[in-house]
UniProtKB/Swiss-Prot annotation:
Role played: Specifically methylates the guanosine in position 1516 of 16S rRNA.
Lineage per the UniProt record: Bacteria, Pseudomonadati, Pseudomonadota, Gammaproteobacteria, Enterobacterales
Major enzyme class: transferase
GO terms, molecular function: rRNA (guanine-N2-)-methyltransferase activity
Keywords: Cytoplasm, Methyltransferase, rRNA processing, S-adenosyl-L-methionine, Transferase
Binding residues annotated for S-adenosyl-L-methionine, in chain numbering: 169
Similarity annotation: Belongs to the methyltransferase superfamily. RsmJ family.
Annotated protein name in UniProt: Ribosomal RNA small subunit methyltransferase J
Entry's EC annotation: 2.1.1.242
Chain's gene name: rsmJ
GO cellular component terms attached to this protein's record: cytoplasm
Length: 249
């Protein structure tokens, strides 16, 4: 994968990530990776006024969301199927920058993130490595949140345990009536493959999940497939379309 590389500081851990994901410098790439003293950040060179982004599981935003979590108001809790003494294993097949995966793991679930894009995988790995060492979250994060670098469409051929739940959060369709998506989403849209594999991924997920497949959608969007949604959990801003696994013949 070619991308513009900016080396602000020499850091062997960060360099190892660059090598691991075979990231090569491209002078003409509009997207850049910044190698800082202890983090890897993504930057859009075509929009120099925008700040760079990184995966930071110990950020103030994550801390706030966790500390102010209320079960009755958090539809993600219900969508995943978490109960008092039941914490399903979860495969996040569209990890992105790992925000929902982090919250699901905070709630007590064992979560595996899958990401096929080398730049995003490098950002996630950097975030995990720093998170594992964090004094506040490291002790539980290293037990519950992990990453597999592969295409989620291959899950039937990967030697991993069947998860109770497969979580899908495909790219939201652009709503022309609203302002541009948040910066993180704009960055991901620029990096990601434009081919929408959501329908195929849903079919594969329904073959592999034990209990349910959870698809996150904005309130204004249609389901990702013509397949029947078994039930829906929603609030004002977004909803979760829940699909049960295919019955084995």
């Amino acid at each position: 994968m070619n991308i513009y590389l900016i080396i602000n500081h020499e850091n062997q851990r960060i360099q190892n990530l660059i090598d691991k994901y075979h990231l090569k410098h491209d002078e003409n790439s509009s997207m850049a990776l910044i190698m800082n003293s202890n983090s890897l950040e993504l930057y859009d060179r075509s929009k120099p006024r925008n700040k760079s982004i990184k995966v930071n599981f110990s950020s103030k935003k994550n801390n706030y969301r966790c500390l102010n979590f209320k079960k009755k108001n958090e539809i993600l809790y219900k969508a995943i199927g978490i109960k008092k003494n039941y914490f399903p294993s979860v495969l996040d097949a569209t990890a992105g920058l790992g925000q929902d995966s982090f919250l699901i793991s905070f709630l007590g679930c064992y979560v595996i993130m899958m990401e096929y894009h080398p730049v995003i995988a490098a950002l996630l790995t950097d975030g995990l490595e720093r998170g594992y060492k964090d004094e506040k979250i490291g002790f539980w994060l290293k037990k519950r949140l992990h990453l597999i670098y592969d295409n989620s469409l291959n899950i039937l051929n990967i030697p991993i345990s069947q998860p109770d739940v497969i979580y899908l959060d495909p790219m939201y369709p652009i709503n022309k009536k609203k302002s541009l998506p948040k910066k993180n989403m704009q960055f991901l849209r620029k990096l990601a493959n434009k081919d929408d594999q959501s329908k195929n991924l849903l079919k594969v997920a329904r073959k592999f999940a034990k209990k349910r497949v959870v698809v996150k959608r904005p309130s204004y969007a249609n389901p990702i497939s013509d397949e029947k949604v078994d039930f829906i959990i929603s609030n004002k801003y977004h909803r979760f379309d829940i699909y049960l696994p295919f019955k084995k013949k």
